[in-house]
Structure formats: C-alpha cells, structure tokens
A protein has these predicted regions:
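Conserved anion/nucleotide-ligand pocket segment
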Residues: 135-205
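Glycine-rich, charge-decorated loop segments at or immediately adjacent to ligand/cofactor-binding or catalytic sites
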Residues: 60-61, 115-136
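Conserved functional hotspot residues or short segments at active or partner-binding sites
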Residues: 222, 227-330
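Glycine-rich, highly charged phosphate/nucleotide-binding loops
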Residues: 4-11, 61-73
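Glycine/threonine-rich flexible loop motifs
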Residues: 86-98
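N-terminal phosphate-binding or glycine-rich loops at protein starts, especially the Walker A/P-loop
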Residues: 1-47
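A short helix->loop->beta-strand "cap" motif at the edges of active sites that frequently abuts
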Residues: 47-49, 105-113
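Glycine-rich, aromatic-lined ligand/substrate-binding cores of catalytic
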Residues: 176-250
Length: 354
C-alpha cells in the first residue's frame, strides 16, 4: 500500500504514529524550524519513541556516512519514520541506507509501516547519466547517476522494484515549514556534502572516490576540488571544460582520506553564474585526460560497479570518442526521464541539460 500525504507529520492521525511503537531513522536534516526541535522529539514527547537510528558520530565528522541498524531492532515496531536529506545522486550513502532498510522490511513477516518525510532535492530536477547496467553497488535502484527525484519518489520507485508489500507513506516536502524557510543544503546532508554547490558536483565527483585522485575529501570544499600528489601543473595545459566552467590550478592538504596530511596538486571546478553543469560528462572527460597523462592515476575496485555503464568504461579506455559517449548519455537520459515521470509526486518534472 502506498500513499502520498500533503499534511505535516505531526498532523497525521495514524494509530501507529499516535499510540504505536515508533522508530526514527534520521540525520541532522530532520530539524523542524517551526517548532525548534528534531523530528524524533515529537515521539519522545508522545512517549512512544522506541528506537532511534542515526549516524554514529557527530555531524560533519569525516567518515560519518552510514546509519547502522539490524532486523532485530525493527522487530515489534509499528512505524518507522525516515527523514534524511538526499543529495541527488544514486551513490549517496544515507539514501542507500534507506533502501537497505526497505529491503529489510520487505523480508519481515510483520513489518512496521514506513513513513518518509520528504525533502526537496538540492541538486534539482536535472538528470545526468544512465540507469545501471550489469553489476551495481548494493542497495542501488535502477535510476540515473543524477536522478532528479526526491527521496520520497525514489522510495516509491524502489518499493515497486523490490516488490514490497508493507505500507509506505510519503509526506510531501511541501508540507514542512522547513522546506519554505530553508534551502535544502542549509543543513549539510553529510560530512562530505557541506555546501551550496556540492550537490551539483556530486554526480560526477562521487566517482573520484574510487580512483587515485581525491575529490578533496577532508577539506572544506569536497567535489569542488580534485587532486593528488602526483599531478603537475603546467601553465600551458588546457584541461577539458564545458562552457561556463573554469578550472583553477590549486593545492590543498586533506585532513583525512587517501592523502591525509599530504600536499595535493589539483584544480578547483568553478561554475559561472547560470551554468547548468553536467558533472558526470565533465568528470569522465577529466578522467580520460588524466588516464592518458599519469600512470599513477588508476580506477580502483568498485569503480565499475559504481558507474555501471559499459559505454562509459569504453570511453575511459579510449575505445570510443566523446561525441559517441555524449549521444549514448543523451539517449539514456531520455529513457530514464520517461521512467522517472511515472514516480513524480510534484508539479515540476525531471529534465536533461541540452
């Protein structure tokens, strides 16, 4: 059973929420601006909060990027309320944790009802890339790299993909005062998604995590910067860059991650005002550029299952030209948009950069 609800969580009259045993699955993004409390405080005040699932460490702590749970902790609950901020790309760990939660509920004999308190997608309705083909990371739905959907819409899609039968209720992002009072990135969605531009960079930038070039994890501007100790700047060098994108040579020293404490040479990706940035295509161009110039640049374990697109791998290997890749991505984006529209819960629709 699926329902889409347009009134706020505290106004829901379901017995499971009013009198039942409730578990809350959330990050710092469940802050209620109107009432000055977190979502789970509602159930603490009602006296029926029985479980709280949240990241292990304080927010913005490097490496804090999963919500841990087990099936036993879900047994006996009447409702699980989820409120996280998705980041717009299918690799986002907290969203994959929600999909893992849904898989677990689908396998339970008496699962609790699942409530998703939806949020606006900080990466907007733009889509990039393709649906997975072949091996793919665990708990990953068949959506484009940058999907253009909200978490609630993704959960509706995943619910159908896994053939779930538990009750799923999505509470509209427009029902929340927080949506009207805050931009979706005001409270950082995760330790590596800290700012306004991060989500625009993440659909491509997230792929660097499975290479020997770091996307500046452990700095204040991850995914806007990239680099490695082996990169050498050359004043005459011309990096691939689409219209409206500038590449500034820079250095940085990450406080954590692959090159913790090491000076990295690299680049800052800067977007001119009004630019609609196709992070995925640009990242693939940069990767091919570095693969052709640095023997130290490698694609590591997990890269192929993360990108999950044979044509993109062929491009990186130099087997097809960029024009062929771009046409492939165009067709795949059109295919994804047709599918995505079936799960759209809001007036604005996913679209591609032309």
């Amino acid at each position: 059973m699926f329902s889409f609800r347009t009134t706020a969580l505290e106004d829901q009259l379901d017995k499971a929420l009013l009198d039942g045993r409730v578990g809350c699955f959330c990050t710092q993004n469940c802050w209620d601006t109107a009432r000055g409390r977190y979502m789970y405080d509602l159930f603490t005040e009602r006296g029926n909060l029985k479980a709280l699932f949240s990241p292990r460490d304080a927010e913005l702590t490097p490496g804090t990027n999963h919500i841990m749970f087990d099936k036993e902790a879900l047994e006996g609950l009447d409702a699980v309320v989820v409120e996280i901020q998705d980041a717009g790309a299918r690799y986002f760990n907290y969203s994959k944790d929600v999909f893992h939660l849904m898989e677990t509920l689908a396998g339970m004999e008496n699962p609790p009802s699942l409530y998703i308190v939806d949020h606006i997608n900080p990466a907007g309705r733009i889509v990039e890339g393709s649906m997975p083909s072949g091996d793919v990371e665990a708990h990953t739905p068949k959506v484009a790299h940058r999907h253009g959907l909200t978490l609630g819409e993704l959960c509706d899609l995943w619910y159908n993909e896994i053939g779930a039968t538990f009750a799923l209720h999505v509470i509209s992002a427009l029902a929340s005062d927080s949506t009207r009072q805050l931009l979706p990135w005001t409270i950082a969605p995760a330790s590596d998604i800290p700012g306004m531009f991060t989500c625009e960079m993440y659909s491509g930038g997230g792929l660097w995590n499975n290479t020997t070039i770091t996307p500046a994890i452990g700095t204040a501007r991850p995914y806007e910067y990239l680099g490695a100790p082996f990169i050498r700047h050359n004043r005459l060098e011309v990096l691939p860059a689409p219209a409206g994108v500038l590449m500034r040579p820079c250095t940085f020293t990450p406080s954590t991650g692959r090159y913790e404490g090491q000076r990295c040479n690299g680049y800052q990706i800067m977007l001119q005002p009004g630019t609609e940035y196709h992070s995925l295509l640009h990242t693939l161009q940069l990767m091919r550029y570095f693969l052709e110039r640095y023997s130290q640049f490698e694609l590591l374990d997990g890269f192929e299952s993360k990108i999950a697109d044979p044509d993109m791998i062929s491009y990186l290997k130099g087997e097809i030209p960029f024009l062929d890749l771009r046409e492939h991505v165009k067709l795949e984006e059109q295919k994804w948009i047709r599918k995505a529209k079936r799960y759209s819960l809001y007036e604005d629709q996913p679209y591609r950069i032309k």
